[in-house]
Design a protein with these regions (language model features):
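HhH-family (HhH-GPD) DNA N-glycosylase catalytic core used in base-excision repair
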Residues: 1-278
Length: 278
């Protein structure tokens, strides 16, 4: 598979898990489906290949020990999504349909820096356009991790790498007006005035407030970073799809406060369903 030493193992996942739905759930932009049923996930410097064998059984290729120490947390496998669906499925017919339709989605715990840059880029962009921009950044400025049937595989670029790249090079990756926001965040992260790892110790509201201080970060982007980068599953990003859902399905009344610390997971079911079936 290239430069990284990858070890192949068979693992069991007994809870809801559907890689196709995860890839299409709008929370991740680099994972992809490959030939012969393989899925590739890249997060930080970690690389995973996963292929379903039979119900609940998967072949995985990753660095030795990384399935237990990294990918188990990345896929939030310590939480029972089946139990969550069972607890909530009688509250609302629309919610019940959405959870059944989205069964297999999981909220990924992704790299904080990658999530910050990706969701700054995401503003007023389609998901395919976000994927192209994020992949171009990785190919041009990220560290090469290895290669597979599709060619070289790269890590997402560090803040230092983006600073060195400069404005023109980032513009060429399709960032548009978002370039200056990404560069400003990269400069702060490279200088140490923005330490995303340290922010993990903050409570939800303080974390959200600190992210909101960054140029180009509004409520939606800050909540996306909280949810998908820090695992704060009570946070609810509100985009045009969620706005429509609240208007059309809940008579304009925000349904998410009733779901408390699991509202962000419910949001993923509803977002996926609304975006898929309208």
């Amino acid at each position: 598979m290239g430069a990284m030493e990858l070890e192949e193992n068979t693992v069991q996942i007994r809870d809801d898990f559907d890689p196709d739905k995860i890839l299409e759930s709008g929370q991740c932009f680099r994972p992809r489906k490959q030939v012969e049923g393989w899925y590739r996930f890249v997060s930080g410097r970690q690389l995973l290949y996963l292929r379903p064998l039979r119900s609940g059984t998967y072949t995985v290729r990753c660095e030795p020990g990384a399935w237990e120490t990294f990918w188990h947390g990345y896929f939030d496998l310590g939480r029972s999504y089946a139990a969550l669906r069972g607890k909530l499925d009688s509250r609302d017919d629309f919610l019940q349909r959405a959870m059944e339709y989205g069964r297999g989605i999981r909220v990924l715990r992704q790299d904080e820096w990658e999530m910050l840059v990706s969701f700054i880029i995401s503003q007023r962009k389609s998901i395919p356009a976000i994927r192209r921009a994020v992949e171009l950044l990785s190919e041009r400025f990220g560290e090469r991790l290895g290669s597979d049937s599709e060619g070289p595989v790269y890590a997402f670029p560090t803040a230092e790498a983006l600073c060195c790249a400069g404005e023109q090079a980032l513009q060429e990756c399709g960032l548009g007006y978002r370039t200056r926001y990404v560069l400003h965040a990269a400069q702060q992260a490279a200088e140490g005035t923005l330490d995303l790892k340290k922010l993990a110790s903050l409570p939800d509201e303080a974390l959200f407030a600190r992210l909101m201080e960054l140029d180009g970060v509004g409520k939606k982007v800050a909540n996306c970073v909280c949810l998908f980068g820090y695992g704060r599953v009570g946070r609810v990003p509100v985009d045009v799809w969620i706005e429509r859902l609240i208007r059309d399905e809940f008579a304009g009344q925000d349904p998410f406060p009733q779901f408390g610390l699991e509202a962000g997971i419910v949001q993923q079911y509803l977002f996926f369903y609304k975006r898929s079936v309208g």
